[in-house]
UniProtKB/Swiss-Prot annotation:
Part of the twin-arginine translocation (Tat) system that transports large folded proteins containing a characteristic twin-arginine motif in their signal peptide across membranes. Together with TatC, TatB is part of a receptor directly interacting with Tat signal peptides. TatB may form an oligomeric binding site that transiently accommodates folded Tat precursor proteins before their translocation. Residues 70-84 have a biased composition (Polar residues). It comes from Vibrio cholerae serotype O1 (strain ATCC 39315 / El Tor Inaba N16961). The Tat system comprises two distinct complexes: a TatABC complex, containing multiple copies of TatA, TatB and TatC subunits, and a separate TatA complex, containing only TatA subunits. Substrates initially bind to the TatABC complex, which probably triggers association of the separate TatA complex to form the active translocon. InterPro entries: TatA/B/E, TatB. This is Sec-independent protein translocase protein TatB. GO terms for cellular component: TAT protein transport complex. GO terms for biological process: protein transport by the Tat complex.
Length: 133
């Protein structure tokens, strides 16, 4: 890493012993060792986070590609089931879409019951439409 040889390490140890003295040298060595281990752990943490982010980005790109390809690559059985789901969703929506004015006049005394089925129907049909797209 630093390309330091054995004799260079011995020279650094002798200089450190002379400068720091025998009382403070062990404490200084521990401090340097803690700093080096903290730096290594921080570098590994950053490396792991970058690898995780790259995996997430790759998965997002694959998802975008799959969405762009749409449902063209589906098997015929899946395409038939998607089409039947689309038709069922349209059939369910037709009666309610054609009669909101007649229901409003007949259920004007209880307005909460008139709006409740529409909310349920819309929320139930949205996932089918999203899947179909």
């Amino acid at each position: 890493m630093f390309d330091i040889g054995f004799w260079e390490l011995v020279l650094i140890a002798i200089v450190a012993l002379v400068v720091l003295g025998p009382e403070r040298l062990p404490h200084a060595i521990r401090s340097v060792a803690k700093f080096v281990s903290a730096a290594k752990s921080m570098a590994n943490s950053v490396k792991d986070e970058l690898a995780h982010e790259l995996k997430v980005q790759e998965l997002q790109e694959n998802l975008r590609k799959a969405e762009q390809m749409g449902m063209q690559n589906l098997s015929p059985e899946l395409q038939k089931s998607v089409e039947s789901l689309k038709q069922a969703a349209q059939e369910v929506q037709r009666p309610y879409a054609a009669t909101p004015s007649s229901e409003a006049s007949s259920t004007s005394s209880n307005p909460s019951s008139a709006t409740e089925p529409d909310v349920r129907l819309d929320s139930a049909s949205q996932p089918a439409e999203k899947k179909a797209e």
